[in-house]
Amino acid sequence: MAYTKIIVIRGRLDKCLSYVENEEKTYLETAVDYALDRDKTERVCFETALNCGRDTAYEDMAQTARRWGKEGRVRKGYHVIQSFRPGEVTPEQAHAIGVELARRALGGRYEVVVATHLDRAHLHNHVVFNAVSFMDGKMYRDSFRDYYEGIRGISDALCREKGLSVIEPGEDAAPS
């Protein structure tokens, strides 16, 4: 079972919105740094960068936005969290599923960092990706339909392929 959620990474909003913002989850650079936090991943093999350098991911993403004239856009990137039921997957399996989710959902068009964190009872992936395609400068679409048919649908399909449980509509989903 993989529980997924997606968070839009935006630039700083007005101070009146600061209450609802969590800077650790909304700034692109901080999200990349958080995903690659060595204290949470324990081993380098649980970090993968797609279409960018692992150590230069933020710089690569910012350069893509500049190259396509999109650096002033509100949406900087996205942070997907994919959490698994405790004991259902190994760290290697969780990471492989996260990388495959990124490949299938984003079609090789965006810079992506996938990091599997082992710091909780439930293993979870952080998939942080640029809102701007490095291939053509197009922005990632982020409607509810795109989420349910795209990211969540692909995550569910991967879980089914691996023989893992899948959250059905209406079930209590969040892992403890």
Where would I find each of the regions flagged by the language model?
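N-terminal nicking endonuclease/strand-transfer module with a His-rich metal-binding environment
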Residues: 1-176
